[in-house]
Amino acid sequence: MGNAAAAKKGSEQESVKEFLAKAKEEFLKKWESPSQNTAQLDHFDRIKTLGTGSFGRVMLVKHKETGNHYAMKILDKQKVVKLKQIEHTLNEKRILQAVNFPFLVKLEFSFKDNSNLYMVMEYVPGGEMFSHLRRIGRFSEPHARFYAAQIVLTFEYLHSLDLIYRDLKPENLLIDQQGYIQVTDFGFAKRVKGRTWTLCGTPEYLAPEIILSKGYNKAVDWWALGVLIYEMAAGYPPFFADQPIQIYEKIVSGKVRFPSHFSSDLKDLLRNLLQVDLTKRFGNLKNGVNDIKNHKWFATTDWIAIYQRKVEAPFIPKFKGPGDTSNFDDYEEEEIRVSINEKCGKEFTEF
């Protein structure tokens, strides 16, 4: 690298530091005094279910007064308690209301009633990366790199706030109207200084240290990035099998096979991300995220332009207007029932 290039890189890294310091101030203000009860259910018309989960659903809604569309996540308090997800749910809302980054879905309102918790988020009509990846088969390396760069920047932001994301997978990445990523579902995100021990995540994406019940840190997100990049470029994840236990055996073995079409730079990056030895895993070394950002596979990536959303996206989802749901699957609709008596009041005081 010439002197001029090195100087440019140095000043870029300095300005990133300043940016992150300011971002942390803004985050901490909201983290310490979270917003509460900023809307209510009858402010919205419910249109259609976009997805379902074990203790709730996500619905497309329309704000009656403004006509804006949102995605409303509805969580049944009793089910959350039964599935021991109180802590995770409180984390999710507290984190979402405090973060602010171009590739994180925005929480617009949150509130609760006798039966449910509600998080109302920006609606991202392009649907999940998962469905586009399955339809196309696999993404070209430039296409995969465009998405990977956004995740790298997002993790750099989150980790600087001591947040671990812990649930990276194509199902949690939505594609917006400009073809950029919106990361959604902060159900497993957690503010951690040092290490944590909870077993959570999706089998194919779990880092070896989580499977081995070791204390783990932010490095699990960099492992998951390796899994995601592999899956985007191959069309299938690096470790898969019929049963989770077989997947876990493959993950901890540290053996990865690459499709013959992977470039040598891609294989090199993935060997450094899918690295069982934490003292060698990229993102976890003394240069932190810069080992990833400066890797040859990302040589053509203009990080600032990606952050500013100035790079032309390789793919724009088809979309017919603000309330279009054609990029989402259909689900059986269910009435939202609200009890006349308060359920689980004290468990969710801080929501």
From Swiss-Prot:
SUPFAM superfamilies listed in its UniProt record: Protein kinase-like (PK-like)
Binding sites annotated in the UniProt record for ATP: 50-58, 73, 122-128, 169-172
Catalyzed reactions per annotation: L-seryl-[protein] + ATP = O-phospho-L-seryl-[protein] + ADP + H(+); L-threonyl-[protein] + ATP = O-phospho-L-threonyl-[protein] + ADP + H(+)
Domain AGC-kinase C-terminal: residue ranges: 299-351
Pfam family, one: Pkinase
Ranges of residues in domain Protein kinase: 44-298
Localization of this protein: Cytoplasm; Cell membrane; Membrane; Nucleus
EC number(s) reported in the record: 2.7.11.11
Membrane topology: Lipid-anchor
Activation/inhibition comment: Allosterically activated by various compounds, including ATP. Activated by cAMP; the nucleotide acts as a dynamic and allosteric activator by coupling the two lobes of apo PKA, enhancing the enzyme dynamics synchronously and priming it for catalysis.
Full protein name: cAMP-dependent protein kinase catalytic subunit alpha
Gene (UniProt): PRKACA
